[in-house]
Swiss-Prot record:
Ranges of biased composition (kind: Polar residues): 423-444
Glycosylation sites: N72, N102, N108, N212, N237
Protein name, entry field: Protein tipE
Gene from which the chain derives: tipE
Tissue: Preferentially expressed in the central nervous system of developing embryos, weaker expression is seen in the peripheral nervous system. In pupae and adults, expression is seen predominantly in heads, body and legs.
Length: 452
């Protein structure tokens, strides 16, 4: 019994902790999924749907404006916090040309930013030699760290500025314009005076897709660090990001959207984007579904079976007590119903002999059979109620009581027939060492009792 109780207790504990675990798992999975939707899942899907070109383009900062007030800040190039309202915004617009490889001499620059297949890194020599005339090795300019290289590019009627790329200036390998004309610009490169801008000749009417009539593929594109234009430190620090890209004339690789060419981002990693999307959906959603399935099964199957087969000890004791009370009540009802068929022993006060008296079904005294010594006088004595079997009422005793009632009823009918013809008494005596006389009397209340 003790082993069964311990086994049952261990099973209940295991069931309790398992249920608690799945409840917590489902709760945290749901909240984690709701948290990841605006910060990871939605930006990842948007990045895929916007179809950004994996081959970087050459971007050049065209305009930088700082606005104040919620009405003026319809968009911002970078903001920390994707859900809060913005009251100060920096808007950066860029011009970009397609295929950065056509404007760089070495592939180590692009390999620093993106990982392309070997086939994508090989370009036909015709495209490269037609663009510019290769410079002699002695014409290259090397910086102190040996990471920079410069070249001159002839573009028909115009001459492109000298481009240096490397990590010496802390630009993380971005193309930097080697120009000393920074007057009228703040530390971040934002124009704060009325002096001429490098691109004043380009009017706003000329913004958009340029086609073949311009050296730029698109003019006035909006620049963002990612597709949502927002983030949180340390992944994205807008202060550092703005210092890097707000300077007018800054050249750097960028990625434009095939769906919306006016949208340009500075960083793109499709592999990491897909990986984040898979993790944010493959972990919370199955965990939540498994938790719901288990809790549903436990509620409709496990706990219902336990309640039917193995109730708690306290409830079991209460049920046992109720069953005992119900049995007592039913036995009392049976005794009350069968009281007409019970037997009463009439004790003789003078001789201490017993007299067996039957009670008719109508509740009155009926046929009485007394057993006494010869010559004794039978007088009424105290009544002792006794069941026909002399024990507690059982199904067998109920059957015996029914038979006794039938016999008493038949004797009552015979007695009534005898009373109609007169008083009939019978007496039988047995002679022997002990002389006993059986006396039978039939009486009906409230009339006198006929005795023989």
């Amino acid at each position: 019994m003790g082993d069964e109780q311990d086994k049952r207790t261990g099973k209940e504990k295991l069931l309790f902790y398992t249920t608690a675990f799945f409840i917590l798992l489902g709760t945290f999975s749901l909240f984690a999924f709701l948290f990841l939707v605006p910060f990871v899942i939605e930006p990842a899907f948007t990045t895929i749907f916007m179809q950004f070109e994996e081959v970087p383009a050459l971007c050049e900062t065209y305009d930088t404006e700082i606005y104040y007030g919620a009405k003026n800040c319809s968009w911002s190039s970078c903001r920390e916090g994707c859900t809060k309202d913005i009251y100060t915004c920096t808007q950066i617009r860029v011009n970009y040309r397609l295929n950065l490889y056509n404007f760089t001499d070495e592939f180590n620059f692009t390999e620093y930013h993106i990982n392309l297949k070997e086939a994508e890194r090989i370009l036909p020599p015709v495209k490269r030699t037609d663009r510019y005339e290769r410079a002699l090795r002695s014409d290259y300019e090397y910086d102190n760290l040996g990471g920079g290289t410069g070249l001159d590019i002839d573009l028909g009627a115009g001459r492109m500025e000298q481009l240096n790329f490397g990590d010496a200036d802390g630009s993380n390998g971005y193309l930097i314009e080697d120009s000393e004309d920074t007057r009228g610009l703040s530390a971040s490169g934002t124009l704060i005076s009325d002096e001429r801008r490098p691109f004043d000749e380009i009017s706003e009417l000329n913004e958009g897709l340029m086609g073949n009539r311009s050296m730029y593929y698109y003019v006035g594109a909006r620049l963002f660090p990612n597709v949502k234009g927002c983030g949180y430190p340390p992944m994205l620090n807008c202060t550092i990001w703005l210092k890097r890209y707000t300077k007018i004339g800054m050249k750097f690789p960028c990625y434009y959207s095939k769906v919306d060419p006016s949208l340009v981002i500075s960083d793109l990693d499709y592999w990491q984007n897909t990986l984040n999307l898979v993790y944010s959906m493959a972990i919370p959603i199955p965990s939540f579904i498994i938790s719901v399935i288990y809790l549903t099964y436990a509620y409709f199957k496990i706990y219902n079976e336990d309640e039917e087969t193995a109730p708690l000890d306290k409830n079991a004791e209460d049920m046992d007590i109720d069953d005992i009370d119900a049995v007592d009540d039913s036995d009392g009802a049976v005794l009350a119903d069968n009281v007409a068929g019970s037997q009463i022993i009439n004790m003789d006060s003078t001789t201490n002999d017993s007299c067996l008296e039957g009670v008719l079904p109508n509740g009155g005294p009926g046929m009485t059979a007394s057993i006494s010594q010869g010559g004794s006088v039978t007088t009424p004595g105290p009544y002792i109620a006794q069941s026909p079997a002399g024990s507690q009422m059982t199904p067998n005793s109920e059957i015996n009581s029914f038979g006794h009632q039938l016999k008493v009823q038949m004797a009552d009918e015979l007695s009534r027939d005898s009373l109609e013809n007169g008083a009939i008494s019978t007496s039988n005596s047995v002679q022997g060492n002990l002389s006993k006389t059986m006396t039978t009397s039939i009486s009906t209340p409230p009339g006198p009792t006929a005795a023989v």
